[in-house]
Amino acid sequence: MKERPMLEYALHPVEDRLVHVDEFCRDLPLLRGLARCPLCSGVLRVVQLRDRTHARRFVHAAGPFARCPLVSDAVPNPLAVNVGPPLTERARQLRASFFAQWQRHLQTIRQTASAFNVTRFTGAIEHADVLKMWGWPTLAQRDIPYVMLVLTDFIAAPGNEKQAAWLRFRFDASVQQIGDLGKPDRVMPRLFRLRYKRPRMSKYPSVRHLIDCQQVPMTAHDMLDAEASLTGADVSAFESFAQKMARTPAE
């Protein structure tokens, strides 16, 4: 039976970076430590494909019992189950600043997930309010679009694209709550995009629909023209939402 998922990259046993399976195998005699999954930190082992390429890949040593979103549908999204602390004045200012820069934030999200529309964006904001996302003291504006991508869970492919993949985003295993972002003693977290085939018999994809998992950059926020490609309908829809939210501020 074919083992899944098969990864080309793993966390380096010693250095703070990803390592390709071929590099890992080449340097194996010099390495002290195990390759680990960047999403769950579980131990990986190397297998060789039984096809013409005979290429090497990483698979989870625990097989189907791995507690990893790449392997099991039962693994919860850690960011979605941890509620933030009570809102402070800083938190309210962070939220107000987010609303003032909403176009830039939406454009940042669309650089990574082009199907993310205004309705999904406003839904993510409401979800963030429920989770008191703004209350985490280390949360920075530049990270908020990526947090919203992770909180959104499955992002459906556009209805007119039959071959398009569904998307899902996860931070690396070091980010178990939003408060883990932005800490002064930690390195930049990694964000991963999981692509899934469009399901035929179910509402959402499962691990059996997984196509691949790739790291995506978290640098788009500083390079965007905030008003580029936003339609008048986008602006009107968000302004209506913002007016409604102003009457019921986050608590």
Please place each PLM-identified region on the residue numbering.
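Intrinsically disordered, low-complexity linker/tail regions enriched in polar/charged residues
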Residues: 1-251
